[in-house]
């Protein structure tokens, strides 16, 4: 699962009778886990940027169309298990699935996401957001190694490589925030559609695993139709500071890969984000978020269930800049502060998101 910065649509009501930054700034609240990417069954299933992501892009309550372009960078190059780092020897000699007599030693997964978001707000209460991702991913692994571990199993000639490039799974999310006169409280209902290639669409192109299918959760799509439920709340806490909170739950309600021996269902994911923004200036808005994610294990014969669940926490500083009257630029860096991962998973040391938002 991956949550985009433009997914959670917080609308700050704009009172044109007021003066100062708060009456003129179209704001961007980057909230969620940045990018919780659909990562590998044998890499990190609970990694993100952003992005949000996991994340929220919000505009003042004016109606109209808005375009959002976003780039997310996630380099998973650290092997972790439980709450600490892991080693190749640990993966093989203390495998997450003892029945295998060893484990897969992954090297790295580099993810680059290019996301297009188009939203329409017919009035102050409703917003509809379409999100289309393009995924560029490379993955390298030393493959499955049997006990006991020996250093020759992690020499460069043992590496296999795979590359994924194409459209990912599209999301359509509706937001309603007419519950309060202030429009500070909102609810979300959405769906993720299986538009990306899934299952065994892409195989390793080099190394000893060449020709073998890439892990199902490393493909561009999951093959599942997911239900998305969310809620968010925004509150000014002083003349210059705002606080916000959001929660989102995503679960697969159907999956194409449902045949014996060829089935895959991504695990459910729950995100929670808390943050503050400093709106002293109308030209630039610094912000800080705490992003939490819990993900259950993937299911099915194509899933690596022991290595796909966990809980992670990120601290995410960000900045939004008003470049033109209708154009805003934003950036977020996500720093992991805690992780408790099942099995062994590849994990990023940091992630980054940059984007622009334009009122059409």
Where are these regions (language model features)?
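Outer-membrane beta-barrel biogenesis signature
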Residues: 39-93, 182, 194-199
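Residues on the lipid-exposed face of transmembrane beta-strands in outer-membrane beta-barrel proteins
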Residues: 55-57, 69-71, 116-120, 130, ...
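Repeated loop/turn-to-beta-strand initiation elements of outer-membrane beta-barrel proteins
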Residues: 65, 126-128, 182-185, 240-243, ...
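Transmembrane beta-barrel strands of outer-membrane/channel proteins
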Residues: 67-73, 130-134, 187-193, 245-249, ...
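Outer-membrane pore/translocation modules
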Residues: 134-263
